[in-house]
Swiss-Prot record:
The gene is gmk. This is Guanylate kinase. InterPro entries: GK/Ca_channel_bsu (IPR008145), Guanylate_kin-like_dom (IPR008144), Guanylate_kinase (IPR017665), Guanylate_kinase_CS (IPR020590), P-loop_NTPase (IPR027417). Gene3D superfamilies: Guanylate Kinase phosphate binding domain, P-loop containing nucleotide triphosphate hydrolases. Residues 5-184 form the Guanylate kinase-like domain. The lineage of its organism: Bacteria, Bacillati, Bacillota, Bacilli, Lactobacillales. It is found in: Cytoplasm.
Length: 209
């Protein structure tokens, strides 16, 4: 049975450990996902490879893709565009490969409007106190910035109902395993495979044998 890949949208508050969990998933040889390559208008840095680290495009090229509806989601940050090219995602999914998109909540909501049958997974901390401890432990943000991130986390957690699944990141290996189990189960949802079986039972050649 030929099956199109799944678009997996993975997000959660800043500091919850999205990148760490994603790295844990991709560190295992048994995963069958491809990490989504983002597009940006920022300058290519030494050692970066176009098409691997990012798709590097000019501002004019990026804005033309926006006008033509060819960006799955995008945002402007510090004067540069960042986003997910729709053509790349569709080409990968058409090969039967799942695409793993780690993204902020607002970007995920953009994706949901365009690809409602994607799998939306929200990663949460055990509680906000632990999230604050993780942010403090980074040692990169001031108290003011941490307070802003906690407030934003409250707002993002309030949008959890827009997602299909929530995974608690209490331990990274366990959280990664839960994510993989969710994706595996999604491949067996009736609505994803029923078309194949409808075609199978309507094939009159079977009754002629």
């Amino acid at each position: 049975m030929s099956e199109r890949g799944l678009l997996i949208v993975f997000s959660g508050p800043s500091g919850v450990g999205k990148g760490t969990v994603r790295q844990e998933i991709f560190s295992k040889s048994d995963h069958k996902f491809e990490y989504s390559v983002s597009m940006t208008t920022r300058a290519q840095r030494p050692g970066e490879v176009d098409g691997k680290d990012y798709f590097f495009r000019s501002r004019e090229e990026f804005e033309e893709l926006i006008r033509n509806g060819q960006m799955l989601e995008y945002a402007e940050y510090v004067g540069n565009y960042y986003g997910t090219p729709l053509a790349y995602v569709n080409e990968t999914l058409d090969k039967g490969i799942d695409v793993f998109l780690e993204i902020e909540v607002q970007g995920a909501l953009q994706v949901k409007k365009k690809v409602p049958d994607a799998v939306f997974i929200f990663l949460t901390p055990p509680d906000l106190n632990e999230l604050e401890e993780r942010l403090v432990g980074r040692g990169t943000d001031s108290e003011e910035v941490i307070a802003q991130r906690i407030e934003r986390a409250r707002e993002e957690i309030a949008l959890m109902s827009e997602y299909d699944y929530t995974i608690v990141n209490d331990e990274v290996p366990l959280a990664a395993e839960r994510v993989k189990r969710v994706i595996e189960a999604e491949h067996f949802r009736v609505e994803r495979v029923i078309g194949h079986y409808r075609n199978m039972i309507s094939d009159k050649r079977l009754s002629d044998k």
